Amino acid sequence: SCAGSCKCKNCRCRSCRKSCCSCCPAGCNNCVKGCVCKEPASS
C-alpha cells in the first residue's frame, strides 16, 4: 500500500506503477519490496 498521496510521476517501472500510485524510489530498485511514495523535489 502507499502512504499518503503520491505526486511523483517520474517512475518508469511498470510493476511499481501498478502497485504504488505511479510512484517509486529512484531507479525503481525497491519495487519488489514495495514502493515508497515521496514528495517530488521542489524545483
From Swiss-Prot:
Record-level Gene Ontology MF annotations: metal ion binding
Key words of the record: Metal-binding, Metal-thiolate cluster
Coiled-coil spans in chain: none
Binding site for a divalent metal cation 3: C2, C6, C11, C16
Positions contributing to a divalent metal cation 1 binding: C8, C11
Residues that bind a divalent metal cation 2: C2, C13
Binding site for a divalent metal cation 4: C20, C21, C31, C35
Residues that bind a divalent metal cation 7: C37
Region feature Alpha, mapped onto this chain: 17-43
Region annotation (Beta) ranges: 1-16
Domain statement: Class I metallothioneins contain 2 metal-binding domains: four divalent ions are chelated within cluster A of the alpha domain and are coordinated via cysteinyl thiolate bridges to 11 cysteine ligands. Cluster B, the corresponding region within the beta domain, can ligate three divalent ions to 9 cysteines.
UniProt cross-references to PANTHER family, sorted A to Z: METALLOTHIONEIN (PTHR23299), METALLOTHIONEIN-1X (PTHR23299:SF24)
Assigned protein family: Belongs to the metallothionein superfamily. Type 1 family.
Function: Metallothioneins have a high content of cysteine residues that bind various heavy metals.
Protein name: Metallothionein B
UniProt organism field: Colinus virginianus (Northern bobwhite)
